[in-house]
Amino acid sequence: MTNFTVIIPARFASSRLPGKPLADIAGKPMIIHVLEKARLSGATRVVVATDNEEVKQAVEQFGGEVCMTSAKHNSGTERLAEVVETLNIPDDEIIVNIQGDEPLIPPVIVSQVAENLCKFKVNMASLAVKIHESAELFNPNAVKVLTDKDGYVLYFSRAPIPWNRDAFARLNSGELKQEELDLADHYLRHIGIYAYRAGFIKQYVQWEPSALEQIESLEQLRVLWYGEKIHVELAKEIPAVGVDTAEDLEKVRAILSNF
């Protein structure tokens, strides 16, 4: 069993759903559901990183560990770097980053991504699932990932990759409908969970943001831009919806109300 620390960034001032870490789901704040899933993963330590006193109080009330961070970070990775520095986490320690809006994340994939990092000797590891619906393929909020034959990432994009020249031309001409598109096993959706060594997180934030990450608004592209490898494997369990919008929140509430 691989030892790892989970850090959960929980930003209070979400643009689409302000205050969402404290949104009530089945009688508990959302961040507590994420915390409980992380604890079930076998992590040796779980830390919530937040810039908000109310979130801090909620987590501590449930016996969780909190690290207060600046409200001025531009990304979740910058928040992680502050936690690593503040808590003096050793450079070789494995950090798993779980988003604070994933109350339904399966614990098994949290440990899986840590194992993936160790198994392939890379600086960063993540997970993906197969895309079976054409609507998801063309949805820019569903990030696509393209890998080589061994699972090393070639690129992440909000666009459909690889681009099926002939089939997509038929789509544009009206000869083919989206629902008739044969997706086979060519398309993968990236899951926003990462594992890295603490020292690599500190290295990452020293790099200047890349043109590609700014165009796509995907911070993981910075890693590829600077020549580092990311390994992705298929998740052992497909995670349910995360909470980005009020509609997502209602879906999650409906799911957890049955438990």
Swiss-Prot record:
| Function according to Swiss-Prot or TrEMBL | Activates KDO (a required 8-carbon sugar) for incorporation into bacterial lipopolysaccharide in Gram-negative bacteria.
Q: What is this protein called?
A: 3-deoxy-manno-octulosonate cytidylyltransferase
Question: Where is the organism placed in the taxonomic lineage, from the top?
Answer: Bacteria, Pseudomonadati, Pseudomonadota, Gammaproteobacteria, Pasteurellales
Its main localization is cytoplasm
Give the gene name. Answer: kdsB
**InterPro entries in the record:** Cytidylyl_trans (IPR003329), KdsB (IPR004528), Nucleotide-diphossugar_trans (IPR029044)
Decide whether keyword Nucleotidyltransferase is in the record: yes
Q: Which GO molecular-function terms appear in the entry? A: 3-deoxy-manno-octulosonate cytidylyltransferase activity
Compartment(s) where it occurs, according to its Swiss-Prot or TrEMBL record: Cytoplasm
Q: What is its EC number?
A: 2.7.7.38
| GO terms of biological process kind | CMP-keto-3-deoxy-D-manno-octulosonic acid biosynthetic process; lipopolysaccharide biosynthetic process
Enzymatic reactions? 3-deoxy-alpha-D-manno-oct-2-ulosonate + CTP = CMP-3-deoxy-beta-D-manno-octulosonate + diphosphate
Q: What is the similarity comment for this entry? A: Belongs to the KdsB family.
HAMAP family from the entry? KdsB
Per UniProt, the keywords (alphabetical) are:
Cytoplasm, Lipopolysaccharide biosynthesis, Nucleotidyltransferase, Transferase
Pathway connected to this protein: Nucleotide-sugar biosynthesis; CMP-3-deoxy-D-manno-octulosonate biosynthesis; CMP-3-deoxy-D-manno-octulosonate from 3-deoxy-D-manno-octulosonate and CTP: step 1/1; Bacterial outer membrane biogenesis; lipopolysaccharide biosynthesis
Which GO cellular component term is one of those annotated? Answer: cytosol
